[in-house]
Amino acid sequence: MALLQIAEPGQSAAPHQHKLAVGIDLGTTNSLVAAVRSGSSEVLRDEQDRLLIPSIVHLTEDQVIVGYEAGKLASQDPQNTIISVKRLIGRSCTDVQQRYPNLPYQFSATENGLPLLKTRRGLLSPVEISAEILKKLTALAEQRLGGELTGAVITVPAYFDDAQRQSTKDAAKLAGLKVLRLLNEPTAAAIAYGLDSGQEGVIAVYDLGGGTFDVSILRLSKGVFEVLATGGDTALGGDDFDHLLAEWIVKKSTVAPQNDREKRQLIEVANQVKVALTTNDKIRISYAEQNLEITRDEFNSLISGLVKRSLLACRRTLKDANLTPSDILEVVMVGGSTRIPYVREQVGEFFQCTPLTSIDPDKVVALGAAIQADILVGNKPDSEMLLLDVIPLSLGIETMGGLVEKIIPRNTTIPVARAQEFTTFKDGQTAMSVHVLQGEREMVTDCRSLARFTLRGIPAMVAGAARIRVTYQVDADGLLSVTAVEKSTGVQASTQVKPSYGLTDDEIANMLKSSMEHAKEDIQTRLLTEQRVDATRVIESVYSALQQDEDLLDDNELSAVKNALVSLQKLIQEEDSLAIKQGIKMLDQATQEFASRRMDKSIRRALSGQHIEHIK
């Protein structure tokens, strides 16, 4: 019933539908995008069923190619094929040229000293190139999820400084992607493993990617992560393992590559051998018309020096945190190179515990980011994860029918402010009661009441015309301020409350557990209540319209409308949400002609007495 239906300003007629949000692992070598679907986090695959999107951008005069196809052009046109742009983002031109003197790119500096790459498409910044990768990931996600994204959580290394973080945000903005939050990569990995679900202690995240090695030491306390120290080696990664294998192959075969294309082919062979040795004790290699064989033990000997380098970085990082390996509760493995059995073995010996490897190390960061994104957009998690964060339980407001609308979801980092607009339910309504609630259940009766106050002085209008903006603001001390403002007059009312006051951790956990145990029945109750509220709203609107314009209908038409009204009123008393929905549809059909005539009447009244030359 388009003419008579009322929706809150800025919202659709279905304000409680699932919002689409993703987690993005914007990696040096590869990037991934993940989302929570049917209650669990999963990485989204491209049309060829591939998880990893190479972080490679190829530029021509008239198009931008991202991913696998761009990678194929790297050896043919290295200057216009940008690889590992993450190394460049947020750095000065001087810094880039000093750190990476062998890059095949030509640089120019801006007035601020930031690097610009000279390409066929002109001068481009690392931010612009990163934006192309994010556009690719966004398009993939929207295609797979079937809708427009609300936003994304993008992961960054824990050691990224403000300039690098802001540059990442700028790249997302350029890509048309809303950043819900930048999340440290080690924190994302820990979330994916559920280490935020009540454990206490210190964890290490060992991240051996394609181009870099990072180690982070985190303290976990009641779901809150504190980064104690970060370290690593920006010149150590899985690519170095490939180069060592390539050197071994050349030495054994006595055949060296003669050009860039042969070098690239050799590296690809080495990479395939490395991957195969993770599950095989020995591998035959066909190279330069020769058949070679390498065992896993030989491979381990080749890479042992690099693995020791990574463990030295771990030792230095532990020292920075005033800790020893025995202080570490868990070790999370991240990055494709941590699949190598020798790496896992050495890391386990160093930290004196078995590393966590059950989640694909290529996926783990993206999966954790997706979980966080799902929380930040206010989707109710279906999993049984108890994540006790700074805001331990969601903060919401009572809406019609005794429903709870979440304003700030649990796990949100403070300080934070969120606002939402509401409207009146009845014609002439001049006051609104604001009921502040805490909890994860769908109904007011199942949540904790924090405060009530009344906003008075709302101008008398038809239902749905007034716009009341309700703002929830939590400061660094956990103090919640709630303010309601009627936008046309500026009249306002507010209250303050300490949401965590009087709640123990056990009580919080019990509230979360209760929400999970009753999730199915809560959703059913919510759906039924929403349909009843919608039906009541429509019925009141139709009765109001009949009082004003009943004369627009003949007796048969009026009888049909009243019969549909009576039928819907009876259905509201039932427990069948689908039947109520059908009843609303039947009333909609019965009132379509009535709505059209009312519109015509309003137009005639508006034009009455005006000359046609005055109407534009």
From Swiss-Prot:
It comes from the Bacteria. GO terms for biological process: iron-sulfur cluster assembly. Keywords: ATP-binding, Chaperone, Nucleotide-binding. InterPro entries: ATPase_NBD (IPR043129), Heat_shock_70_CS (IPR018181), HscA_NBD (IPR042039), HSP70_C_sf (IPR029048), HSP70_peptide-bd_sf (IPR029047), Hsp_70_fam (IPR013126), ISC_FeS_clus_asmbl_HscA (IPR010236). PANTHER family: HEAT SHOCK PROTEIN 70KDA. Chaperone involved in the maturation of iron-sulfur cluster-containing proteins. Has a low intrinsic ATPase activity which is markedly stimulated by HscB. This is Chaperone protein HscA homolog. The gene is hscA.
